[in-house]
């Protein structure tokens, strides 16, 4: 009987389960403060599990990605689209930074008043702080959650192992798969953690806490829509000197719609390839560019990482300088490229960006947990933006005469 319940839960729809957890959490938070405190243990366990796996995830994900990917045989078109993917992701992260400056959001979190970390303000202090974090001992970086140090050693290790044997690379691929399975298991437990977090949040802060979540979600979705209809439109127009919106709406209708519900760029690859074929793009080109885009074209993830990191900074009262904002845009761009193929990958990379501002690791992970609460909508919109942009950029880089008469 118990095993059947576990199997039924494991096969269940995660979105539906999270929604149930949110509703039950609100009801418990309103009705009983005592039960909410007990339920909060589930939230603490969930965030603790995320804190434990996140450093290892970032390290092995980036190291494996660098040492196993081979672009040496790429032609001019592939090199162009790689550049376009990275530029598009950077512009998305820059838009997210600007959006947060104009419409800052503060979250209601327990423990924020105890946060004593301050962000360096002078350029010399910023670079000194960055350099010391970068050259941190790799073991210490992993144990303390120093994500800049983790990122540095992962990149260095990936480059150093670039020319190792295929058998050695396969070992890292297998380790990467093992870590991803652990992450998927933890994420599958998200409904229980979210239930506890929501119950405690409602009991402690009332409607004010939930309202801050809604404001954050609106900021995220609005920024992603701005990237879709303004930034991407400008990129297409600059590249083709043609009206970008017919192609954008085709990509939204035939790619974003499916990606919204699958919540996976990888799962949407066959859909995108079929759309590219209908558009009349060379198979040799989109056969490489679409899977590549599902790996490194992460505009939506960059928006999520940048906005939630700055929201964490706003919450603890840290003022961000222009230089730090620029550095955040760069970090969010490359962190987003490492978020592919991971359930909640963009959320788990938020501590990497938060480390730029000396934000306490516990607070960063609380923001990650809130990201899972709003992720029912945020992750769907993020994936829709990521996946539809794969086709959009593939189409304009292909130089083919496109077929716009698609039903």
Swiss-Prot record:
One of its GO terms (cellular component) is plasma membrane. It comes from the Bacteria. Keywords: Amino-acid transport, Cell inner membrane, Cell membrane, Membrane, Symport, Transmembrane, Transmembrane helix, Transport. InterPro entries: Na-dicarboxylate_symporter, Na:dicarbo_symporter_sf, Ser_Thr_transp_SstT. It is a multi-pass membrane protein. It is found in: Cell inner membrane. It holds the Pfam family SDF. One of its GO terms (biological process) is serine transport. GO terms for molecular function: neutral L-amino acid:sodium symporter activity. It catalyses: L-serine(in) + Na(+)(in) = L-serine(out) + Na(+)(out); L-threonine(in) + Na(+)(in) = L-threonine(out) + Na(+)(out). The chain crosses the membrane at residues 12-32, 42-62, 81-101, 141-161, 179-199, 218-238, 245-267, 288-308, 330-350. Belongs to the dicarboxylate/amino acid:cation symporter (DAACS) (TC 2.A.23) family. Involved in the import of serine and threonine into the cell, with the concomitant import of sodium (symport system). This is Serine/threonine transporter SstT. The gene is sstT.
């Amino acid at each position: 009987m118990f095993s059947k319940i576990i199997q039924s839960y494991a096969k269940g729809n995660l979105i539906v389960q999270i929604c149930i957890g949110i509703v039950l959490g609100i009801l418990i938070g309103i009705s009983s403060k005592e039960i909410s405190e007990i339920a909060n243990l589930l939230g603490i366990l969930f965030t603790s599990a995320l804190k434990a796996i996140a450093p290892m995830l970032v390290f092995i994900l980036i190291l494996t990605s660098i040492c196993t990917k081979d672009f040496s045989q790429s032609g001019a078109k592939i090199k162009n689209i790689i550049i376009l993917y990275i530029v598009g992701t950077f512009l998305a992260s820059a838009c997210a930074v600007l959006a947060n400056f104009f419409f800052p959001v503060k979250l209601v979190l327990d423990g924020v008043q105890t946060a004593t970390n301050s962000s360096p303000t002078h350029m010399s202090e910023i670079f000194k702080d960055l350099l010391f974090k970068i050259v941190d001992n790799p073991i210490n970086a992993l144990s303390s959650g120093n994500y800049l140090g983790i990122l540095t050693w992962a990149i260095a290790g990936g480059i150093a192992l670039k020319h190792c044997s295929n058998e050695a690379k396969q070992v890292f691929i297998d380790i990467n798969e093992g870590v991803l399975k652990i992450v998927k298991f933890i994420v599958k437990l998200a409904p229980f953690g979210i239930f506890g977090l929501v119950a405690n949040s409602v009991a402690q802060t009332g409607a004010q806490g939930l309202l801050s979540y809604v404001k954050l979600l609106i900021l995220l979705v609005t920024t992603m829509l701005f990237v879709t209809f303004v930034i991407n439109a400008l990129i297409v127009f600059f590249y083709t000197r043609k009206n970008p919106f017919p192609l954008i709406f085709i990509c939204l209708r035939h790619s974003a719609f499916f990606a919204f519900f699958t919540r996976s760029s990888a799962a949407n690859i066959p859909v995108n390839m079929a759309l590219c074929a209908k558009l009349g793009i060379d198979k040799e080109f989109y056969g490489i560019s679409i899977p590549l885009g599902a790996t490194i074209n992460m505009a939506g993830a960059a928006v999520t990482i940048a906005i939630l990191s700055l929201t964490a900074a706003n919450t603890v009262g840290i003022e961000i300088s222009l230089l730090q904002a620029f550095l955040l845009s760069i970090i969010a761009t490359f962190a987003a490229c490492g978020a592919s193929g991971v359930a909640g990958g963009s959320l788990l990379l938020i501590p990497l960006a938060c480390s730029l501002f000396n934000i306490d690791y516990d607070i960063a992970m609380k923001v990650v947990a809130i990201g899972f609460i709003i992720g029912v909508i945020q992750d769907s919109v993020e994936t829709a933006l990521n996946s539809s942009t794969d086709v959009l950029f593939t189409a304009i880089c292909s130089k083919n005469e496109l077929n716009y008469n698609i039903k």
